[in-house]
Amino acid sequence: MHYMFTNSSLRSRPTLYALCFSMLLFVFTLAGYNFDNYGSCFTVSATSIVVSLACACIAFCCALFLFQKAEKNEGIAIHSSYICFSLKSLFLSSAIILLAWMPYYLACFPGLYVYDAITQVYYSLGIGVINSFHPLVHTYWLTGFLSLGNLVFGSYTAGFAIYTFSQMLVMSICFAYVLCNLSQLCRRRSVYFTGLIMVCLFPVFPILAVSATKDSAFSALFSVFVVQLAKLCRHEECFLGSKKEVSVLFISALLSGLFRNNAMILIVLLLLMLIVVYRSKRQFIVMALIPCLILLLLLGSVVPKKISQITSNSSEILGLPIQQIARTMLLQSDSISQDEKDAVVSMIPNWGLYNQRIVDPIKFSGGTSQAIADDLPSFLRLWAKLGFEYPRDYIDAFVAQTEGYWYIFSNYDTVGTTKPYLEFDQWEVMESGTLGRDMGQAGYDVYNVQDIENWIIPFRHSLLPSLLPVIRKLCYDPFWMNSLFLRLVTSPALVVWSAFLLAIVSVHFRKMDLMIPAVTIIAYTMTCLLGPCYLIRYAFPLYCCAPIILSLLLGLFDCSESLSS
């Protein structure tokens, strides 16, 4: 390692980039460590500094080694030809994944009816209201199979079983496609097997595969979109000359945007970015991607707003500002002026319900969501004014709600106390007008409803009942959260920092097109920072893209000659 620290090396641009990367990691690690241990990121100790410096030093050495290894191999090597995989490999990989997931499906049969599924079904089938608060494409995929099961078999449970299996099938094909394409990003077969083991055996994958949530299918489709972007960067001429590759990019971009409301704008911006980066082939890109943009805007925004009786509003992306104002009111009420207090109360009446990990108790009570949407400019002015006066409280509020995405040692037992790691128990009718469900360490959730007969709940009938307690424990008390090493290895933040490192390396070698996959992952993470809380299902796309980022980083070690042979 001595060659890393020669005088010429210390004066080089790679050293500067590596230093900037490591210092940024130092700042975020220090903030996360301080907040978790002392309640504020501004309460610093010798221990927190030592831990953060150690992480920064390791990051600096890794980054510098990566720069120098890539330079030795003549920069970022670009494959000159495809390393095609066969349909047999795709089907075999998909079958292996499905087989590995099957015990979860049989144990949880007909699937995990959790998260927002019960609400989506209530509006669609229970009272016949079009509600685009959740993506319509997922709502009608779910309710369509429920209706089919009820029509053919006289059972919503049968329909839900078909839906769950269809979701598993779609996800297994998507992941198999991603894994089979890793050979086009680097020449190490070990990456394929590592990714396959991760998808098959890491419990987050099979559990979310049998869970009725839009995040499951979105994550799989998003990983296909990202791997297509990576292939475009590595094989520009071949990729753009292949109708099949462009079609997969088109379809994955369209479906990814339709399966998550906050991802639609991200996908639109990325497609526009492609047009700018590949301006020499602007006409072809425009001809291929403009229809995708139009369809995405029509199906994801215009049509839902026109046909929906209930839609989301601007407050959906203002969870963090709401939390920052509420935290400031809670901690600085004695020094805030009466006019400012009145302004806060008029928009956030129940700010006293502040929970530093989730905004929902405030946002969905007292008419907060609608009040902010009705007078957004006033809310933003109030937010900015209090932010200038109390920046520390704003920063602490940011750390409290988002650290799971960027703090590599984040423990879900600390950051996720309002929601379980993964949901397992579904809603049950407790008594007339009341629905309830167990949420593990997060407590018991109760929901009072007026029309209990309109709430549809499939019956859970486990075909492997002995496995149910094991899966339940994996959802509520995952063993990898109890080990510092396993927590680090399975941290979504590790994927984000790896993507950031790839972006920096791309800047150094002036390969701006290679930045696109890394920027895509970073940009998705930034959309999550605006969400209501940190949840594993929101971070699931980061897990799905981990093999892609690993392949791109390992590809820096491949020699140009070997890649073109």
Residue ranges and their predicted role:
Residues 18, 88-92, 178-201, 219-220, ...:
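Transmembrane-helix signature of polytopic, membrane-embedded enzymes
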Residues 125, 177, 217-237, 253, ...:
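Specific aromatic-rich, kink-prone transmembrane helix
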Residues 162-186, 224:
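Transmembrane-helix motifs of polytopic, lipid-linked glycan transferases
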Residues 1-24, 41-101, 556-564:
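Start-transfer (signal-anchor) and selected internal transmembrane alpha helices
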Residues 115, 207-218, 259:
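Short acidic/glycine- and proline-prone juxtamembrane loop motifs at membrane-interface regions
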Residues 245-260, 271-272, 291-296:
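Membrane-interface alpha helices of multi-pass inner-membrane proteins
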Residues 108-120, 129-145, 149, 153-158, ...:
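Extracytoplasmic catalytic/substrate-binding loops of multi-pass membrane glycan-assembly enzymes
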Residues 309-462:
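Membrane-proximal stem/loop segments at transmembrane-domain junctions that anchor or position
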